[in-house]
């Protein structure tokens, strides 16, 4: 690389770009990202050539990330410049090449001179508009890729690194430490090399994914030959009925498609059992529609299970403690009058006997706990149902009739204290006011009448009034003459 320092940087072929080639997981979930761009800041960890480095923070709780390889090496393998995973499927290079049967180990040279010449040759073809022969090509994804591909971004990969001082027990920052206070993971996945990831050799993550693909179970058809329905789970508003029809129609004729958006699932029913088995075999563990991985299972019949008499009776009076006694006894007995001419015949049980189906509005009167007279302190008829008052009410009626008063008896006192008060069942209720006798009523006020002697004396003392025939003469006026 020493001879390159004497030449013009613009004609050298080094990378100069305005935006990196990265995956959605490394970019982060924040739509507003501030990036730092530095030309020729680092050398590529694959070809050792200077390139433009981009640095940014993908999220609030994430660490700063930067590009690790140049765009030339990135385009040769179709991988991200940061995590070196496939841009289309999100898988390591070794998993992708193994699934697509691509042998790219010998396609890219590893020596310094040959690798530099190989990169410059591809850059020249790219500037000339020639589609250079990349190692990955454009192949159709097979079953292994469809099973293992990542359909949604994985932002957990952008978390901060583990604090090394915390591992040694010497971190004094506490909650202000920008690194994670966790113990590091040990095992095969902790030893990873960037060159092994790029070339697809001895990658522990790829080996784990390939082993997982071989252990995935397949859908076993049920023994019941009448089942022709497949269950699809994990739906959202983006997937429509037409999308499901386009995906499943290639395996057989579809009888019906029922979507249950409240449960985020759907049921696809085929006209034949062979079509359902073929769809379950070809789409098991690899059903992806509009980039969303869906769950595929065999449907189960929903046959009603009849209950015995005792279980049905218990379910029918499950809320018996909240109803009046008359209603409870009527439900428990189940004795309903039969129409004339039907005595002694067994009636068919109604639908509510087997299923707890609520009655339609207005069919019967709704009973609430507040309507129970036994919990409101009201007068309750005797249990015989003859309408006679109880013993306490009869005693109070006899006492009121003997005294001749219509108001109840005054409150009694026990040893100078009020009788103990117990709150009613179901919550607090203020005690009722004790009735007292009303104050005595007096007749309305009338003025006192005078006796005959007093009336004669008063009339003699008062002068007689002038009559109409007597002229009232004014008193004479005295005049003086000068």
UniProtKB/Swiss-Prot annotation:
Gene Ontology molecular function, alphabetical: DNA binding; pre-mRNA binding; U6 snRNA binding; zinc ion binding
GO cellular component labels: Prp19 complex; U2-type catalytic step 1 spliceosome; U2-type catalytic step 2 spliceosome
Keywords: DNA-binding, Metal-binding, RNA-binding, Zinc, Zinc-finger
Residue span of region Disordered: 329-482
Species of the source: Oryza sativa subsp. japonica
Biased composition range(s): Pro residues: 429-446, 473-482
InterPro entries: Cwc2/Slt11, Nucleotide-bd_a/b_plait_sf, RBD_domain_sf, RRM_dom, STL11/RBM22-like_N, Torus, Znf_CCCH, Znf_CCCH_sf
Gene3D superfamilies: 3.30.70.330, Zinc finger, CCCH-type
Classification via PANTHER family: PRE-MRNA-SPLICING FACTOR RBM22
Positions of the RRM domain: 228-301
Domain of life: Eukaryota
Designated name of the protein: Zinc finger CCCH domain-containing protein 40
Zinc finger (C3H1-type): 157-184
Pfam annotation, one family: STL11_N
Regions of compositional bias (Low complexity) in chain numbering: 329-347, 389-428, 452-466
């Amino acid at each position: 690389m020493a001879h390159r320092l004497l030449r013009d940087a613009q004609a050298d072929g080094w990378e100069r770009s305005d935006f990196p080639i990265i995956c959605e997981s490394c970019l982060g979930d924040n739509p507003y990202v501030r990036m730092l761009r530095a030309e020729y800041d680092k050398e590529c960890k694959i070809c050792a050539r200077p390139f433009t480095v981009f640095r940014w923070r993908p999220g609030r709780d994430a660490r700063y990330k930067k590009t690790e390889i140049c765009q030339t090496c990135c385009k040769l393998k179709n991988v991200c410049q940061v995590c070196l995973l496939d841009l289309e499927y999100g898988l390591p290079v070794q998993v992708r090449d193994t699934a697509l049967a691509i042998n790219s180990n010998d396609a890219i040279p590893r020596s310094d001179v040959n690798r530099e010449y190989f990169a410059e040759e591809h850059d020249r073809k790219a500037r000339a508009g020639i589609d250079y022969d990349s190692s990955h090509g454009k192949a159709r994804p097979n079953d292994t890729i469809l099973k293992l591909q990542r359909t949604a971004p994985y932002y957990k990969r952008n978390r901060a690194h583990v604090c090394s001082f915390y591992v040694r027990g010497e971190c004094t920052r506490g909650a202000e430490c920008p690194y994670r206070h966790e113990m590091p993971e040990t095992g095969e996945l902790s030893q990873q090399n960037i060159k092994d990831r790029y070339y697809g050799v001895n990658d522990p993550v790829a080996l784990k994914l390939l082993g997982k693909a071989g252990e995935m179970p397949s859908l076993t058809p049920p023994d019941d030959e009448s089942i022709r329905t497949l269950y699809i789970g994990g739906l959202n508003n983006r997937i429509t009925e037409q999308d499901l029809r386009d995906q499943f129609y290639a395996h057989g004729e579809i009888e019906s498609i029922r979507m249950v958006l409240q449960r985020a699932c759907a049921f696809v029913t085929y006209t034949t059992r062979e079509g359902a088995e073929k769809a379950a075999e070809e789409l098991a563990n690899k059903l992806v529609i509009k980039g969303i991985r869906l769950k595929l299972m065999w449907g189960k019949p929903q046959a009603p299970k009849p209950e015995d008499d005792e279980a049905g009776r218990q379910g029918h009076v499950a809320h018996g403690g909240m109803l009046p006694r008359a209603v409870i006894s009527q439900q428990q007995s189940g004795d309903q009058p039969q129409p004339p001419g039907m005595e002694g015949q067994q009636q068919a049980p109604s639908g509510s006997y087997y299923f707890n189906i609520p009655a339609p509005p207005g069919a019967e009167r709704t009973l609430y706990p507040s309507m129970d007279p036994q919990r409101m302190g009201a007068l309750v008829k005797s249990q015989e149902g003859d309408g006679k008052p109880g013993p306490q009410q009869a005693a109070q009626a006899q006492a009121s009739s003997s005294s001749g008063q219509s108001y109840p008896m005054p409150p009694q006192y026990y040893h100078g204290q009020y009788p103990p008060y117990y709150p009613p069942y179901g919550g607090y209720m203020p005690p009722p006011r004790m009735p007292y006798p009303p104050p005595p009523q007096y007749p309305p006020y009338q003025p006192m009448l005078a006796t005959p002697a007093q009336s004669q004396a008063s009339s003699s003392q008062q002068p007689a009034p002038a009559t109409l025939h007597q002229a009232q003469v004014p008193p004479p006026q005295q005049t003086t003459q000068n």
